[in-house]
Amino acid sequence: MTERSFDSFEVVENGLTEEQILQNPDCLISSHDENHPANVICKLCEQFFHNNWCTGTGGGISIKDPKTNYLYIAPSGVQKEKMKREDLFVLNETGDKCLRKPSMYKPSACTPLFLACYKLRNAGAIIHTHSQHAVMCSLIFKDVFRISNIEQIKAIPSGKIDPVTNKQIALSFFDTLEIPIIENMAHEDQLIDSFHDIFKRWPHTQAIIVRRHGIFVWGSDINKAKIYNEAIDYLMELAVKMYQIGIPPDCGIGEEKRYLEMPM
């Protein structure tokens, strides 16, 4: 490849041939558009590091480019607050061909899990964090995280479709948010069977908690995935605090008084 500054590469557009990509794979990650997947992943990884969700190289993000359907994936072993566009992997739409790989890093062990979310959940983006709130909830709850009657629940879709607008119906204040919990394994790619099982038994879930590990959250695009992740983390933190003062997170409205009146 000829010597050129990184920002001088042309932005990839629909219709770019594989030969062109092969000659200049960095065109897939070069863009001044703040909404380009390469830029969004780097920005969010830094933000999630400062949120204490992706420290010590933990966690990851993958985004499907809505223009090309190429899959952008954060690598393994990179400090998230220092991630650069050059660090990213780019796969084709089906995930069976690597179009661009960094020189220094290995593929994320989460890659098979991300691909399963794209294929079986029609996801547009997946966020994986090592949130302490997720880990704490995985220790408090047995198989399913539950929290009820909290305003922030309304940020999460119910899985139901409005017959008039044909849009997702959100959970209501009076609903219970449920997120399945699976057991952790030695390596993240070994979680794939558990993911497939959850996809069959929980067709409408937007997240999976991995015990003593963290959480995976997905959405139809990165904006929705980010909203769901933030809302769920808020609810998990609240659930832990409720548990600490003796209130079941899924208790009914007004029932908290009964638990607060009980001797500690």
Curated annotation (Swiss-Prot):
Cellular component terms per the entry's GO annotation: cytoplasm
Gene Ontology biological process terms from the UniProt entry: L-methionine salvage from methylthioadenosine
Enzyme's top EC category: lyase
Active site (record annotation): E151
Pathways per UniProt: Amino-acid biosynthesis; L-methionine biosynthesis via salvage pathway; L-methionine from S-methyl-5-thio-alpha-D-ribose 1-phosphate: step 2/6
Annotated residues for binding of substrate: C110
PANTHER family given in the database record: METHYLTHIORIBULOSE-1-PHOSPHATE DEHYDRATASE
Keywords for this protein: Amino-acid biosynthesis, Cytoplasm, Lyase, Metal-binding, Methionine biosynthesis, Zinc
Textual note on the cofactor: Binds 1 zinc ion per subunit.
Catalytic activity, reaction form: 5-(methylsulfanyl)-D-ribulose 1-phosphate = 5-methylsulfanyl-2,3-dioxopentyl phosphate + H2O
Record carries keyword Zinc: yes
Function in brief: Catalyzes the dehydration of methylthioribulose-1-phosphate (MTRu-1-P) into 2,3-diketo-5-methylthiopentyl-1-phosphate (DK-MTP-1-P).
Similarity section: Belongs to the aldolase class II family. MtnB subfamily.
Binding site for Zn(2+): H128, H130, H213
KW Nucleus (keyword) present: no
Official protein name in the record: Methylthioribulose-1-phosphate dehydratase
EC numbers: 4.2.1.109
Natural source organism: Vanderwaltozyma polyspora (strain ATCC 22028 / DSM 70294 / BCRC 21397 / CBS 2163 / NBRC 10782 / NRRL Y-8283 / UCD 57-17)
Subcellular location: Cytoplasm
Pfam families assigned: Aldolase_II (PF00596)
HAMAP family: Salvage_MtnB_euk
